[in-house]
Amino acid sequence: MALSIKHPEADRLARELAARTGETLTEAVVMALRERLARTVGRTQVVPLREELAAIRRRCAALPVLDDRTAESILGYDDRGLPS
């Protein structure tokens, strides 16, 4: 299977890494990918999910209040929790 990356910086970085390590271009890319994958092992969706939820909280907190009534009042319940 062939991998064709047409990105000048990717090419430059791969060549620089290969030159520093004495590896072929393919070896340098494979090793870099293996090392990156090894660093991500054990990571779960917790970190991205936490960041996503924090962003949602920030967006919700920034929303204007359009109705000053309490949630119970909006839903139609009285102070005893019964429909009013």
Swiss-Prot record:
Subunit description: Forms a complex with cognate toxin VapC.
Induction: Expression is low but constitutive, and repressed by VapB-VapC. Member of the vapB-vapC operon.
Observed effect of gene inactivation: The vapB-vapC operon is not essential; cells grow faster than wild-type on rich and minimal glycerol-containing medium. The operon deletion mutants die faster than wild-type under potassium-limiting conditions, which is prevented by overexpression of vapB. The vapB antitoxin gene can be disrupted without causing death, however despite elevated vapC transcription, no VapC protein could be detected, suggesting that RNA processing and translational coupling are important in VapC expression.
InterPro entries found in the cross-reference section: VapB-like
Transmembrane segments: none
Alphabetized Pfam families for the sequence: PSK_trans_fac
Protein's recorded name: Antitoxin VapB
GO MF entries: DNA binding
Coiled coil start-end: none
Keyword tags: DNA-binding, Repressor, Toxin-antitoxin system, Transcription, Transcription regulation
Highest taxon of the lineage: Bacteria
Function: Antitoxin component of a type II toxin-antitoxin (TA) system. Upon overexpression neutralizes the effect of overexpressed cognate toxin VapC. Overexpression alone prevents cells from entering a nonculturable dormant state, probably as it binds endogenous VapC. The TA system acts as a post-transcriptional regulator of carbon metabolism; in M.smegmatis 3 TA systems (VapB-VapC, MazE-MazF and Phd-Doc) may be involved in monitoring the nutritional supply and physiological state of the cell, linking catabolic with anabolic reactions. Translation of vapC mRNA requires VapB.
